[in-house]
């Protein structure tokens, strides 16, 4: 019988029940029954993560529901309690005198992850973790509360997208002004929220013995194979190789359109003819995706059919729904769920194929032996998502209007390249923020403008007050909710673009290599997974150089010096 999302029901954990179950793990360890203890430990974590994922998903589906908010707050309060038990058991196993027996039961990578995990928690920061989760939830709810008037309708921030991509320049400018009016109105509250988050995180780092939050954040992200200096070198690679190409792309657009100046509201209009739209509404797109994945072969089609028929998709934008898109999973049943906000633009296709990449990877690696291995660290996970965006290119005729597939492909490539400077801008901003946690809100806004001048030198807000004064970063939820995550998109995109290059030479080989990468799940750290896939590490000097050259040729743009 096919699994249906509507029938999923994960027991609500209590502190008492959790203490009992984790206590059973300790008892088994006391009896030297390591294999049984590890099996129970894994089961408990799968049960808890499934319930927690469902709780977060339901809140995202309706942020206005008091019941959903209450349950999410309850989950946030449980997280430090559960983490304390998990860390204690991990520490006990890592300190076990019979490391040969432990090593026989757990992979070296799992043990390395656990060594990292035990340095990120202590009962002294339990209250701070709960406060961090609460403040992050406040940001989500505030952004979801936006009610914006434009074009005779009331929309949320996601609903602005069709206006922001209009071929009418005045409409795009209006959308930009409406967007930033919301952030200007809520700017002081957003500044206060962020200030509290920065100090909560800085205090946690101090309590755990770190010099600054950055080092703790890297460990929380389970980055066991690279550090801030490696990331700084990658940022310079982007600045050296990608920023000049994006500048030329934007200058060609300005000249083509005959504009005296290119403003921020002109950047979303990637194609002067108007950004290609997908072939129809939500229902049509979902149906056409089935044809596309069936055509790609292998088990992509059958997997997507399971998701579609089982109700594991929530793609339509609606009032009260949290913004953005994500993929979550329920490890007790081995089935992922895709959440998105379709808004009628080409972005719907990008978000959908991106989250489908996450979902497919999680499904392919569902049989790996430990819950720690079901997902890669997020840097590697984003390769799976972004690579699928490019691997679906040959089938875009199914997803966009007739004759617009090639325009879509060019637009997707330009959008991907343009993202890289913004991605490293966000990352550099965060490194500076947490190096100086006592900055005032005004200093943080000045810092953002400094970062924009460094990585986005073309950016001109046309005098719109809030972003011109350095407030653009407040719209980037990752900065509030997931510090230091954003660079993962840029690192992964460097790798995904190599899949694009490979697919242009041999689509079948690229797809085989992609499936193999998905099957590995989180069985190795980022740089090892990259190497196993035959990709060049983003941290290697010149990693982006050849990709940028091929992209420039594809787009018929001469690079500086050519």
Language-model features and meaning:
Residues 110-112, 214-220, 260-265, 324-335, ...:
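Active-site-adjacent bridging/hinge elements
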Residues 108, 113-115, 352, 360, ...:
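C-terminal, non-catalytic "cap/extension" segments appended to globular domains
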Residues 120-121, 178-186, 226-232, 267-278, ...:
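Glycine- and acidic
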Residues 350-351, 362-387:
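Post-HEXXH active-site segment of zinc metalloproteases
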Residues 194-200, 204-205, 210-211, 249-253, ...:
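Long, well-ordered alpha-helical segments
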Residues 158-170, 278-353, 358-362, 465:
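Active-site-adjacent "gating/activation" loops or surface patches in catalytic cores
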Residues 315, 379, 383-398, 405-412:
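Conserved active-site neighborhood of enzyme catalytic/cofactor-binding cores
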Residues 1-276:
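A well-structured
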């Amino acid at each position: 019988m096919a699994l249906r999302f509507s029938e999923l029901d994960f027991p609500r954990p209590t502190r008492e029940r959790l203490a009992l179950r984790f206590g059973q793990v300790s008892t088994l360890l006391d009896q030297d029954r390591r294999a049984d203890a590890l099996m129970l430990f894994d089961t408990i974590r799968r049960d808890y993560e499934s319930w927690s994922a469902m709780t977060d998903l339901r809140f995202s589906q309706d942020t206005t529901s008091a019941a959903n908010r209450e349950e999410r707050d309850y989950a946030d309060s449980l997280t430090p309690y559960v983490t304390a038990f998990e860390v204690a058991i991990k520490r006990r196993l890592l300190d076990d005198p019979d490391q040969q027996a432990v090593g026989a039961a757990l992979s070296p990578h799992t043990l390395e992850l656990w060594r990292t995990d035990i340095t990120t928690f202590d009962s002294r920061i339990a209250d701070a973790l709960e406060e961090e989760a609460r403040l992050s939830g406040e940001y989500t709810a505030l952004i979801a509360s936006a009610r914006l008037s434009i074009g005779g309708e009331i929309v949320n921030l996601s609903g602005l997208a069709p206006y922001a991509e209009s071929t009418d320049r005045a409409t795009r400018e209006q959308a930009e002004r409406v967007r930033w009016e919301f952030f200007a109105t809520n700017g002081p509250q957003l500044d206060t929220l962020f200030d509290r988050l920065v100090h909560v995180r800085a205090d946690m780092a101090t309590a755990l013995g770190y010099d600054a939050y950055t080092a703790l954040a890297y460990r929380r992200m389970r980055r066991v194979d690279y550090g801030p200096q490696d990331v700084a070198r990658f940022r310079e690679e982007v600045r050296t190789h990608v920023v000049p190409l994006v500048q030329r792309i934007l200058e060609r657009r300005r000249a083509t359109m005959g504009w005296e100046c290119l403003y921020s509201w002109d950047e979303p209009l990637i194609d002067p003819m108007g950004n290609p739209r997908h072939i129809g509404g939500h229902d049509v797109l979902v149906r056409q995706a089935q044809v596309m994945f069936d055509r790609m072969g292998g088990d992509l089609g059958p997997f997507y059919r399971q998701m579609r028929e089982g109700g594991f998709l929530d793609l339509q934008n609606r009032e009260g729904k949290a913004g953005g898109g994500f993929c979550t999973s329920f490890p007790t049943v081995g089935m992922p769920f895709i959440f998105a906000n379709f808004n009628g633009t080409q972005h719907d296709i990008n978000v959908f194929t991106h989250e489908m990449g996450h979902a497919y990877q999680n499904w392919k690696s569902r049989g790996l032996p430990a819950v720690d291995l079901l997902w890669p660290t997020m840097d590697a996970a984003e390769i799976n998502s972004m690579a699928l965006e490019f691997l679906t290119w040959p089938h875009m005729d199914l997803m966009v209007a007739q004759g617009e597939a090639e325009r879509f492909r060019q637009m997707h490539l330009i959008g991907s390249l343009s993202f890289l400077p913004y991605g490293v801008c966000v990352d550099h901003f965060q490194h500076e923020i947490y190096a100086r946690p006592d900055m005032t809100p005004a200093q943080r806004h000045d810092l953002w403008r400094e970062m924009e001048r460094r990585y986005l030198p073309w950016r001109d807000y046309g005098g719109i007050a809030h972003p011109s004064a350095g407030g653009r970063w407040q719209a980037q939820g990752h900065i509030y909710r997931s510090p230091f995550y954003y660079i993962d998109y840029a690192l992964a995109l460097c790798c995904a673009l190599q899949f694009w290059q490979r697919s242009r030479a041999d689509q079948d080989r690229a797809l085989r290599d992609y499936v193999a990468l998905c099957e590995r799940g989180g069985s190795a750290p980022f740089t090892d997974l990259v190497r196993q896939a035959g990709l060049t590490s983003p941290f290697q000097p010149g990693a982006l150089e050849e990709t940028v050259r091929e992209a420039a040729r594809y787009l018929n743009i001469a690079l500086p010096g050519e």
